[in-house]
């Protein structure tokens, strides 16, 4: 087709419309058709067209027997009468006229039956109108960029205009009012001109071709058999039988019964879809042409006709329509109303979004329900929050209903009965399928309990009690231990109160292992949670039975595996991936990264410290450990084919558990060395307490664990002592497992450990010691920290300390008891989600299990948890159906009977269970009551788009809308065979199960209906399927859905032969819209066209601006499009939010959730910025999103923090930001600034609110302060140095002092800025110059100095600089620090000799320098002070602390004589130092290197013996000399200090560096015993030296 198009603009009410004025010539040669003309004009009066518009629920359009009246026909003239008869019948039935038919009936010759393209002429506007429109539009268009350029927030980038907010971010979906104009910025943020209306200006006259096509494309009849529909509703994928087929694209021929064509070949819901269809199909059929929004309706219709002709040609050449079905299906998926675009948002559900099925609906009555009680978790089972439980704002209901796929309505009593039926089938599978009870499952794992009605817990518990008597005794209970996957903290107490019939996980302990051990070092927590953050506090666990039973695990098939794979795919493979929807290829790539990461010491994704986690799991008391397959074998790869790096460690622990792990438990965590450690001890079988002695088995059982989570850990010489219990005194222990620099070394036998030198012996109190070299941190693929596990030497090879369960009747009302027998169990989660598909029979999981039972036995496995054995769905909608792990199924009775599932066939399952039973293992089935995946049959259901809680998504296009779901099973599957099949039998055997009223409904289960075929009425809802909001077709005007049922018949008029040209048109007065369903002008109706929402008022014309419609507020731009998902800021600065349906959020909306975000609305305004709600200050950003757990700086520069839960401004508390800066929020919630007193702390905060730590602050008064680097406290009374090396002194008030100061006896000086003066002079206010030492800063006296100005100054005795001539007879220090002397004549002495000073003292000058200190001159021992003046008649304490005396006349030092000074008598010995003062009785004194002693009688002791001094302390004198140090006196080893005083009752470090302790009574050194010293116990060995540090 060749087409020339001219575009014109016409101004209508200040809006501009693009008019397309086109002429088209379609060449007949394009189709090889001969050219013929129609002699008779077709009628164009719409009023004469056949229009059918019956009420959808009451009126009929036609009966099955009535054909639609023809408007044109290709039949031969012989068919005319028949057509006339049909028309007449149609008139009678529908009460309408068909004048067009009569006209059409005159064109019956063969040539006229062929399709011939005609030229379309556009009419309706004068040249003057078009010219004016063009000129004005050009001027208007040119002015727009200049207007935008004037806006300060708008910037042009790559030719487009963007609006930037105050933070520099581009605003999207945003409209702003500026003056009298409104500017709109679309979803990309780019400005979009909304002043133009795209409307069709062509003539509304109907072409002859359009009439012919309409006549032949009408439905063959309105009988439902002529339509492909879902529950009689037409969909975008519907096909129908037209009246005629344009055979080979040339000749209209009556259709046959199999000649179905796509509905979209003849009808489209709007112009945009029609244009998209033409453009899409042009490519399919080989037409090189693209149509735009400016294309007229007439040209678009002609293009669609050409596409239809080409389609028919290709059908003829291909001889099938398979290709067409594929093309149409693919096209449908491209249209937003028929794909996920109209189902958004995608952030509130694991599968992007949820659909809630309406309970009451006239449109789909077969899908109604009286139940669908959502979120009836243990926390909310009755519909009200259980008062027993603590409210958790992060998990308000303890779970939610919509998890995955088709969500089973577990509140429906009929469904509840079916769940019981299925449970019975599952547990009796061997008996039912193979007539072999030995192949029955023993127990179940309840999947995703927090996502189903908690009544299922009651039903399953009651069945287990009735069928197995688990409440009768522990033996029965332990043979049928069923577990629950329930993550809420409320679930375990719920199960406990219900009788502990089912066992829940210890999720707290899982989290403790995750954060203490498995995470990278920079985010790891301490080790203390491993003791206390658990269902069992293990600091001291000497209980016979724990309060609640539980099982524990580190990882699982769906925990800490698929999350990591998801993260890898998102980060490194497909950044556009969402949630858990990824392909097998992406999974395979991710596992290459995952497996390599597992082998690294520095991991990016996988878990650290797996051996440490398993050490705790497999040695802890009070919970059944569950080992995960993927920790021993790679998650991917064939089953059990590839061991992980942690396999040997876990296997070693498993085998040791059977042999050693028993008894009470004690755990400790404390700081030691440069880090912290965790210790755990099990005392052995028969010893619950540390003091229990037990028996022989006790002595050969038990285990000790020491671990840490810091790879740089060192004991730093400290000792760790493990109290292994009284039963293990003086016993050898050997290593079972030790971390090394390369990994983890394991030792299977005593001999292996002995050979490695890893054997220790406990002391007589049962302590096992670890010294400095024993415990060192390492970093390798297995351990990031350190690990040691020790067990007793001497256990028999076949020792098994496990305990059998008792058959004594239970009397406490509980079924499961976590006692020693329960502790003896080990679960094995025997599969991975991601294991590879078998390539041959021997690779199937169940085959491999049967062949490896002995291995599981050797590990001590007691309960084998099988993978879910259901044949998987392959719909690929979610990870589970991609990897086919068994959790995505459509027939839950099919355990590999119809075909092999991922794990094998039903027969292989039977063999695996029997093999496990043969070795005494119990086998657990996976019971998955929550969801079912894509069924083979579809239904139309009335649905509402909701979040995972079932709360409607505000503004969603899916609101009580019809939607096609995959919710109906085949009716000929195993569900049909076994569904409800056992209910009668169960009711007879266990009648109590059918009379007990369930908590959520108050009703008993209902066995009266046997569910043989699943359908929507049994489901709560489903996930969104990407079919779009309008996939079930409807009339936009009446909102009626097209339906082909005889009693609710409603079809588009196009299918009844009427020519319908829909879309927006300009009629010379305004903009109107013709319905795509009827062709009539729309009035008082919303219309969606090209994804835009319009409203046409009561007069039929398009509205603009703010409008209130049916009580709701909307805003329509100049081009008539409604604001949707858009924030509009009006001229007053108020923000309004228009939802996806165009409605403005109003006051009654209050808080509204948008995905994970919240907004607040009042009086039609959206909260932006600081807002007070119910008395609480909250903050909403520029887009209205509430700030939670965020620090916000508001426009006034103030800092606030808003609570992570309620969003309220936090007050009177400290907070820290992500960079480590701290703030204090005052009583008004604003971060304080400046100096503040908080509690007893004096703190300072910058102007931005950040607390000052480790830095100086200058106050407004100019005072300098310093604040501590850790606490932020203001420093007082202390010196501090800044980064530049300047020193300051902070006074009592914290301010840096200035001027002259005397601090701690030092005379110092500080500048006006607080800096201390060092190495420089200061001119005081008295005009005098002083100098302060360069190192100490102390004022200098009697010294010559060189100041910073380069000048030399002589500082006198008073510290003031003087003229040298005034220092006669004085000493002083010169600039080099040497002490010089001016004689009494004022002359500087440069020689040597004695000189008298001005105060009549004497100095001795040697080579010009005055001597100081001890000197020997001419045989005399003399002493000179620091200023060089000789000491006479005075005592001098030397640098060695000893006292000497110098004669008052000669100055000679006194030797071997007594001297009385100031009334005290001193004796100076051989070395000239004072020995004693005053009364010498009972005193020692130094005589050179010897110590001597005066007895209490005052006699100098010269012999040997024990003596008591004046203080009652004991000494020993030997040959006149007092003994010191470690000595042997008689038979005693004793110790005397440096003064000769005997040590008693104290620990002493002796000369060999060792610490010894001496008895408090005898003073004898103790050996080979513990002793408490300063509150801590130490062990002292055979030589008396301390060996170990023990406990506090």
From Swiss-Prot:
Highest taxon, organism lineage: Bacteria
Protein function: Production of extracellular glucans, that are thought to play a key role in the development of the dental plaque because of their ability to adhere to smooth surfaces and mediate the aggregation of bacterial cells and food debris.
Its EC number(s): 2.4.1.5
Region (Disordered): 39-119
Composition bias, Low complexity: 39-108
GO molecular function: dextransucrase activity; glucosyltransferase activity
Protein name: Glucosyltransferase-I
Top enzyme class: transferase
Segments for region (Catalytic): 200-1044
Organism whose genome encodes this protein: Streptococcus downei (Streptococcus sobrinus)
Protein's cellular compartments: Secreted
GO cellular component term of the entry, any: extracellular region
Pfam families to which the protein is assigned, alphabetical: Choline_bind_1, Choline_bind_3, Glyco_hydro_70, KxYKxGKxW_sig
Signal sequence extent: 1-38
Positions of Cell wall-binding repeats: 151-170, 172-191, 1083-1102, 1103-1122, 1167-1186, 1211-1231, 1232-1251, 1276-1296, 1297-1316, 1411-1430, 1455-1474, 1523-1542, 1567-1586
Reactions catalysed according to its record: [(1->6)-alpha-D-glucosyl](n) + sucrose = [(1->6)-alpha-D-glucosyl](n+1) + D-fructose
NCBIfam families linked: glucan_65_rpt, KxYKxGKxW
Family under the similarity heading: Belongs to the glycosyl hydrolase 70 family.
Keywords: Dental caries, Glycosyltransferase, Repeat, Secreted, Signal, Transferase
GO biological process: glucan biosynthetic process
Residue spans crossing the bilayer: none
């Amino acid at each position: 087709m060749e087409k020339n198009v001219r575009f014109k603009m016409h101004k209508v009410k200040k809006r501009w419309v693009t008019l397309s004025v086109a002429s088209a010539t379609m060449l007949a040669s394009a189709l090889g058709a001969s050219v013929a003309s129609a002699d008779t004009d077709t009628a164009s009066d719409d009023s004469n067209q056949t229009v059918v518009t019956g009420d959808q629920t009451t009126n009929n359009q036609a009966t099955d027997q009535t054909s639609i009246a023809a408007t044109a026909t290709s039949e031969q003239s012989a068919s005319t009468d028949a057509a006339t008869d049909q028309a007449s019948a149609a008139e009678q039935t529908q009460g309408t006229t068909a004048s067009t038919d009569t006209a059409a009936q005159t064109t019956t010759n063969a040539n006229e039956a062929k399709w011939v393209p005609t030229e379309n002429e556009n009419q309706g506007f004068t040249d003057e109108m078009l010219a004016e429109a063009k000129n004005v539009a050009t001027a208007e268009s040119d002015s727009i960029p200049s207007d935008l350029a004037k806006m300060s927030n708008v910037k042009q980038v790559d030719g487009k205009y963007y609006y930037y907010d105050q933070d520099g971010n581009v605003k999207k979906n945003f409209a702003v009012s500026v003056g009298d104009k409104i500017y709109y910025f679309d979803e990309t943020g780019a400005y979009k001109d909304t002043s133009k209306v795209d409307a069709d200006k062509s003539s509304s006259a109907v072409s002859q071709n359009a009439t012919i096509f309409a006549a032949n494309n009408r439905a063959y009849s309105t009988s439902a058999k002529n339509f492909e529909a879902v529950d009689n509703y037409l969909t975008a994928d519907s096909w129908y039988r037209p009246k005629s087929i344009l055979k080979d694209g040339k000749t209209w021929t009556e259709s046959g019964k199999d000649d179905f064509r796509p509905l979209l070949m003849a009808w489209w819901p709007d112009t945009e879809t029609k244009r998209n269809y033409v453009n899409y199909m042009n490519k399919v059929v080989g037409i090189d042409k693209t149509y735009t929004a400016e294309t007229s309706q007439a040209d678009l219709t002609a293009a669609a006709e050409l596409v239809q002709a080409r389609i028919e040609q290709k059908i003829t050449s291909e001889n099938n329509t398979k290709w067409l079905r594929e093309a149409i299906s693919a096209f449908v998926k491209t249209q937003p109303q028929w794909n996920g675009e109209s189902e958004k948002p995608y952030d509130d559900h694991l599968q992007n979004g949820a659909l809630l099925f309406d309970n009451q609906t006239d449109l789909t009555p077969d899908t109604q329900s009286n139940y669908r009680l959502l979120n009836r978790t243990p926390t909310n089972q009755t519909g009200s929050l259980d008062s027993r439980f603590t409210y958790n704002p992060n998990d308000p209901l303890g779970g939610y209903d919509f998890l995955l796929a088709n969500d089973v309505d577990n509140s429906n009593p009929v469904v509840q009965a079916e769940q019981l039926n299925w449970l019975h089938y599952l547990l009796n599978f061997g008996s039912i399928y193979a007539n072999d009870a030995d192949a029955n499952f023993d127990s179940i794992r309840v999947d995703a309990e927090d996502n189903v009605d908690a009544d299922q817990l009651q039903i399953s518990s009651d069945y287990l009690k009735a069928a197995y008597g688990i409440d009768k005794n522990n033996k029965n209970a332990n043979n049928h231990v069923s577990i629950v996957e329930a993550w809420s903290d409320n679930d375990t107490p719920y199960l406990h109160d219900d009788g502990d019939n089912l066992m829940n996980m210890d999720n707290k302990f899982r989290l403790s292992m995750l954060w203490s051990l498995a995470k990278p070092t920079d985010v790891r927590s301490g080790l203390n949670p491993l003791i206390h953050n658990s269902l069992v506090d293990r600091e001291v666990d000497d209980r016979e039975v724990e309060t609640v039973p539980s099982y524990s695990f580190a990882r699982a098939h769906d925990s800490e595996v698929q999350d990591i794979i998801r993260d890898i795919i998102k980060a490194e493979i497909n950044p556009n991936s969402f949630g858990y929807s990824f392909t097998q290829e992406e999974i395979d790539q991710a596992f290459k990264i995952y497996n390599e990461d597992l082998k690294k010491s520095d991991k990016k994704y996988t878990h650290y410290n797996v051996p440490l986690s398993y050490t705790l799991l497999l040695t802890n008391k009070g919970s059944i450990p569950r080992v995960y397959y993927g920790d021993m074998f790679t998650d991917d790869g064939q089953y059990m084919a590839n061991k992980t790096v942690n396999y040997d460690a876990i296997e070693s622990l498993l085998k040791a558990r059977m042999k050693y792990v028993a008894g009470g438990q004690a755990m400790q965590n404390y700081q030691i060395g440069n880090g912290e450690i965790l210790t755990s001890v099990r005392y052995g079988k028969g010893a619950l307490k540390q003091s229990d002695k037990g028996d022989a088995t006790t002595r050969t059982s038990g285990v000790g664990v020491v671990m840490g989570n810091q790879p740089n850990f060192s004991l730093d010489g400290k000792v760790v002592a493990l109290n292994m219990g009284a039963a293990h005194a003086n016993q050898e222990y050997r290593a079972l497992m030790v971390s090394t620099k390369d990994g983890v070394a394991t030792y299977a036998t005593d001999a292996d450990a002995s050979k490695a030198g890893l054997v220790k012996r406990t002391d007589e109190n049962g302590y096992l010691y670890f010294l400095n070299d024993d415990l060192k941190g390492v970093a390798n693929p297995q351990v990031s920290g350190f690990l040691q596990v020790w067990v007793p030497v001497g256990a028999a090879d076949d020792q098994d300390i496990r305990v059998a369960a008792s058959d004594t009747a239970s009397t406490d009302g509980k079924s499961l008891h976590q006692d020693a027998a329960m502790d003896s169990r080990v679960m094995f989660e025997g599969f991975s989600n991601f294991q590879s598909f078998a390539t041959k029979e021997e690779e199937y999981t169940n085959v491999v299990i049967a062949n490896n039972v002995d291995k599981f036995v050797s590990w001590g496995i007691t309960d084998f948890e099988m993978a879910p054995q259901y044949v998987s769905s392959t719909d690929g909608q979610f990870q589970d159906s991609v990897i086919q792990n068994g959790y995505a199924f459509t027939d839950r009775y099919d355990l590999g009977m119809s075909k092999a599932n991922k794990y094998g066939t039903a027969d292989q399952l039977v063999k695996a269970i029997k093999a496990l039973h043969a070795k005494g293992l119990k086998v657990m089935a996976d019971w998955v009551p929550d969801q079912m995946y894509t069924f083979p049959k579809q239904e139309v259901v009335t649905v509402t788009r909701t979040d995972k809680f079932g709360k409607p998504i505000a503004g969603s296009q899916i609101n009580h809308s019809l939607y096609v779901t995959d919710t109906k099973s085949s009716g000929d599957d195993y569900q049909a065979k076994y569904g409800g099949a056992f209910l009668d039998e169960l009711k007879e055997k266990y009648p109590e199960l059918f009379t007990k009223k369930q908590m959520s409904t108050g009703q008993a289960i209902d066995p009266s209906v046997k569910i043989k075929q699943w359908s929507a009425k049994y489901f709560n809802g489903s996930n969104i399927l990407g079919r779009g909001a309008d996939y079930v077709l409807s009339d936009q005007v009446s909102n009626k859905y097209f339906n082909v049922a005889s009693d609710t018949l409603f079809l588009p008029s196009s299918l009844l032969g009427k020519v319908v040209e829909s879309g927006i048109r300009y009629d010379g007065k305004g903009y109107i819209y013709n319905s795509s369903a009827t062709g009539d002008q729309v009035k008082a109706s919303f219309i969606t066209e090209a994804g835009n929402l319009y409203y046409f008022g009561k007069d039929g014309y398009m509205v603009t601006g703010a409008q209130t419609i049916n009580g709701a507020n909307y805003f329509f731009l100049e081009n008539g499009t409604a604001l949707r998902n858009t924030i509009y800021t009006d001229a007053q600065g108020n923000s309004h939010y228009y939802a996806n349906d165009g409605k403005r959020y109003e006051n009654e909306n209050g808080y509204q959730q948008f995905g994970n975000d919240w907004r607040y609305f009042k009086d039609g305004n959206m909260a932006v910025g600081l807002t007070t709600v119910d008395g609480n200050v909250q903050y909403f950003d520029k887009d209205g999103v509430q700030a939670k757990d965020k620090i916000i700086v508001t426009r006034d520069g103030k800092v606030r923090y808003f609570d992570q839960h309620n969003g309220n401004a936090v007050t009177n508390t400290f907070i820290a930001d992500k960079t480590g800066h701290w703030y204090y929020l005052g009583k008004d919630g604003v971060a304080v600034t400046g100096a503040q007193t908080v509690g007893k702390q004096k703190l300072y905060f910058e102007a931005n609110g950040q607390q000052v730590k480790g830095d100086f602050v200058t106050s407004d008064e100019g005072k300098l302060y310093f604040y501590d680097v850790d606490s932020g406290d203001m420093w007082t009374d202390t010196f501090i140095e800044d980064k530049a090396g300047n020193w300051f002194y902070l006074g009592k008030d914290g301010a840096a002092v200035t001027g002259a100061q005397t601090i701690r006896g030092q005379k110092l000086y500080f500048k006006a800025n607080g800096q201390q003066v060092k190495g420089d002079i200061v001119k005081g206010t008295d005009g005098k110059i002083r100098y302060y030492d360069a190192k100490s800063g102390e004022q200098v006296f009697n010294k010559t100095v060189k100041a910073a100005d380069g000048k030399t100054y002589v500082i006198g005795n008073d510290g003031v600089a003087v003229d040298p001539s005034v220092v006669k007879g004085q000493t002083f220090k010169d600039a080099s620090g040497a002490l010089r002397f001016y004689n009494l004549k004022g002359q500087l002495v440069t020689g040597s000799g004695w000189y008298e000073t001005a105060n009549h003292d004497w100095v001795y000058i040697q080579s010009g320098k005055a001597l100081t200190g001890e000197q020997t001159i001419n045989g005399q021992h003399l002493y000179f002070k620091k200023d060089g003046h000789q000491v006479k008649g005075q005592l001098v304490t030397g640098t060695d602390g000893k006292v000497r005396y110098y004669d008052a006349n000669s100055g000679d030092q006194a030797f071997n004589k007594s001297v009385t000074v100031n009334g005290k008598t001193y004796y100076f010995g051989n070395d000239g130092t004072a020995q004693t003062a005053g009364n010498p009785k009972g005193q020692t004194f130094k005589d050179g290197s010897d110590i001597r002693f005066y007895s209490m009688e005052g006699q100098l002791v010269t012999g040997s013996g024990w003596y008591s001094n004046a203080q009652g302390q004991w000494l020993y004198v030997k040959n006149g000399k007092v003994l010191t140090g470690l000595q042997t006196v008689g038979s005693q080893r004793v110790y005397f200090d440096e003064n000769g005083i005997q040590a008693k009752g104290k620990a002493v470090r002796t000369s060999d560096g060792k610490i010894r302790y001496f008895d408090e009574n005898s003073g004898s050194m103790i050996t080979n015993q513990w002793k408490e010293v300063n509150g801590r116990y130490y062990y002292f060995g055979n030589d008396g030296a301390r060996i170990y540090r023990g406990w506090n």
